[in-house]
């Protein structure tokens, strides 16, 4: 039986994913930032109530992937916490100012992670040379890489994804961004073993009173009266339609556009 991974931004989403057939969860906060490190409260609650494997993201802020010393120190502390809480894996990524994988920091990340499976997220798509980056990540012992082939969506980047897959069996190449049921077969035909797609909806906030003249966001255009929710029916449908009984493919369903 193939694995189905859902990227969740709340305890409620994690429960929905689990109930509807997910085999693994990527846990994030802040969907509008593309996924940030979840709070301690969310981490502990999910660890206590979710029985399928959960991989939290370690990303202290939105934006680029070159971090200050203080930000990186916080990332290492978060990794230690995730490990202490008993999670089986995590998702993260760090770059140099020149767009290379920061190998010095990756060594520290891998040491802090210990036995946890590490996924290098779409910071990979911001690398100057994806093939050098993949070799470095293989040397570092990373389990998988999430990538759109350095294009706006994975369909456009499929040729690069195929070249990356041809480099070897490890790390696993997970295609993400714009992967849908109607183009999934293209990725399978290309030899993709894991894909990253969407199974969520934005719902209106239940707030009746709304102060339309005031925003709590730095982005005054931000919609603060909508909330992301994993759609159970979509999870179940994807699990039925796209999980191969051979167990050779992992279908990854993510909310919004997590890194």
UniProtKB/Swiss-Prot annotation:
Keyword annotations from UniProtKB, A to Z: Cytoplasm
Keyword check for GTP-binding: no
Broad class of the protein's primary localization: cytoplasm
Cellular component terms per the entry's GO annotation: cytoplasm
Transmembrane segments: none
GO molecular function, one term: copper ion binding
InterPro entries assigned to the protein according to its UniProt record, in alphabetical order: CutC-like, CutC-like_dom_sf
Compartments it resides in: Cytoplasm
SUPFAM superfamilies reported for this sequence: CutC-like
Domain of life: Bacteria
Record carries keyword Endoplasmic reticulum: no
Family membership noted in the UniProt record: Belongs to the CutC family.
Subunit structure: Homodimer.
Official protein name in the record: PF03932 family protein CutC
Gene of this entry: cutC
């Amino acid at each position: 039986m193939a694995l189905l991974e859902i990227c969740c931004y709340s305890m409620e989403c994690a429960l929905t994913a689990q109930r509807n057939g997910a085999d693994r969860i990527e846990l994030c906060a802040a969907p509008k930032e593309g996924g940030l490190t979840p709070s301690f409260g969310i981490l502990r609650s999910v660890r206590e109530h979710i029985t399928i494997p959960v991989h939290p993201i370690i990303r202290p802020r939105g934006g680029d992937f070159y971090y200050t010393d203080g930000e990186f120190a916080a990332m290492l502390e978060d990794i230690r916490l995730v490990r202490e809480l008993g999670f089986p894996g995590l998702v993260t990524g760090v770059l140099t100012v020149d767009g290379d994988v920061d190998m010095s920091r990756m060594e520290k990340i891998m040491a802090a992670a210990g036995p946890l499976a590490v996924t290098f997220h779409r910071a990979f798509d911001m690398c100057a040379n994806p093939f050098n980056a993949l070799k470095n990540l293989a040397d570092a012992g990373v389990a998988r890489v999430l990538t759109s082939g350095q294009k706006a969506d994975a369909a456009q980047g499929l040729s690069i994804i195929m070249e990356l897959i041809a480099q070897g069996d490890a790390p696993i190449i997970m295609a993400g961004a714009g992967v849908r049921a109607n183009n999934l077969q293209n990725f399978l035909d290309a030899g993709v073993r894991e894909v990253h797609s969407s199974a969520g909806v934005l719902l209106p906030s239940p707030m009746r009173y709304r102060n339309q003249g005031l925003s709590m966001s730095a982005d005054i255009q931000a919609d603060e009266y909508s909330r992301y929710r994993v759609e159970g029916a979509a999870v179940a449908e994807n699990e039925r339609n796209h999980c191969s009984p051979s167990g050779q493919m992992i279908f990854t369903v993510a909310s919004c556009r997590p890194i």
